[in-house]
Amino acid sequence: EKPKQFNYDVYEGSQASCITPVHTNPYNLTGKGVLIGIIDSGIYYAHPAFIQDGVSRIAYLWDQTVSDDSSRSDIIPFGTLYDRDTITKAINAENSLEMQRICPSIDISGHGTHVAGIAAGNGNGNDNEQNTKYRGVAYESTLIIVKLKTSGGASFPTTTQIMLAVDFCIRKSIDMNMPIAINLSFGTSNGSHSGTSLLETYLDYIAENYRCAVSVGSGNDGAGFGHANGKSYPAD
């Protein structure tokens, strides 16, 4: 059989997902004036895609895993909150050690970073030149990031931690007087499967009562044997 040539389909990702027409005339939607909330594993905040003209595009980064009593408040019961000024100071630090001292938040898995890039990356690379081919959906938006804390020995957070993260994003959206789109790129096969669990009803309430959109991942457990299967036979 003759060898075949393959291409990177990711190049046409924006077009296939119908984003390209939204970015161009007559809509020209870029995310400017809108908040994007990424609730995930954190973010590599020093990536050029999240920096514009030397200033971080991240308004707030709540790292639930970094302990700092000075950050505690009614909406920050644990973890540490970093604002845009602190993050910008970190990305402009003289070296990586100083950067981590100023803002020690790390995206260990990289999942949150790539999700944020798809949603809001501005296309900037290491040369700081914008590449429109690789920019995200809302590439001129402002980011609010929550790095979720895991519970006990588990690898993923609990519903309570997720609800606190959503509440934080909404409160900051109100403070900044900007609409927000919140992304939750994870899920579970546990629960009611009827939309009546605590987290599900909470997200419904938020989406119906505030100027926001909430996107939740689904379908990733299709091959995970989380449902009944096997063969059935008629009874004797």
Regions inferred by a protein language model and the residue ranges of each:
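Autoinhibitory N-terminal propeptides
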Residues: 1-25, 35
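Conserved beta-strand termini and adjacent loop/short-helix elements that scaffold enzyme active sites
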Residues: 2-3, 146, 217
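Short gly/pro/ser/thr-enriched loop/turn and capping motifs at secondary-structure boundaries
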Residues: 5-8, 66-68, 222-224
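Histidine (H) residue identity feature
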Residues: 11, 23, 47, 111-114, ...
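Subtilisin-like serine protease catalytic core
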Residues: 25-160, 177-178, 209-211
